[in-house]
Amino acid sequence: MSAFCLCMFTACDSDDNNLLCYGTHTDIEGDVTAFGAVGDGKTDCSKAINSAIASLPAEGGVLVIPEGDFVLDAPIVINKHNVTIKGLNPGMRSNIDVNGINDLLGPGGGSKLVARNAEAAIKVETGMKGVKIMNLMVSGGTEAKNIGIHFAGATDNGMLSNIIGINLHTGVKIEQAKNMQIVNCWVCELPNRCRK
C-alpha cells in the first residue's frame, strides 16, 4: 500500500475570489532557502540560488523564491532547459522601502530579488528552452547598469509572468528569442528602457 501526499502552501490573503493569490508552493518544488538563501535584504544569495539550479535534474524543475528580499551580488544563471523560477507573489509596493522605525515593519512583502552588485538579477543562457520566471519583484541595487532579467540569446518558449521590475537600468533584455510570452508584467522607474 502506497500513499502520495501533495501539500499546498500559499502566501495569499484569503479572499473569496483568490484575487490576491499569485502562487502556491508544493512539496515537490525546491525552495531556495533549503540551499542557504536568506531573504533578509542583506545576505548575498547568488551562490545559494545558483546551487539550487545546479541541483535540478537535466530535464529541469521548479525553484521557489519565498517571501523576502533576496540580495544578489552576482546573477542567477539559468543554464538548463525547462527551469521555472517562481516567487509566491511579486509583493506590489511603492518605490520607497523606508529605513527607520524598525524598517517600518520590515520588508514590503512578496518575493523580491535585489540586484545589489549583479549586472543582471537573472541571466538565461543562450539556447535555453522552456524557461519560466513568475511572481517576482526584481529591483536594482548599487550596480549602475544592471538588468532585471536577461535572455542572452536564441532562447525558445520562455515566459515572464507577474513580474514587477523597478529601479533597474534595463528592466528586461531579450535577444533572439522565439515564442516568448510576457504576461501581466509591470516595469517602472528605469533610466533606460523596458525591453531590447
Label every PLM stretch briefly.
Residues 82-88, 129-140, 156-169, 178-196:
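Right-handed parallel beta-helix
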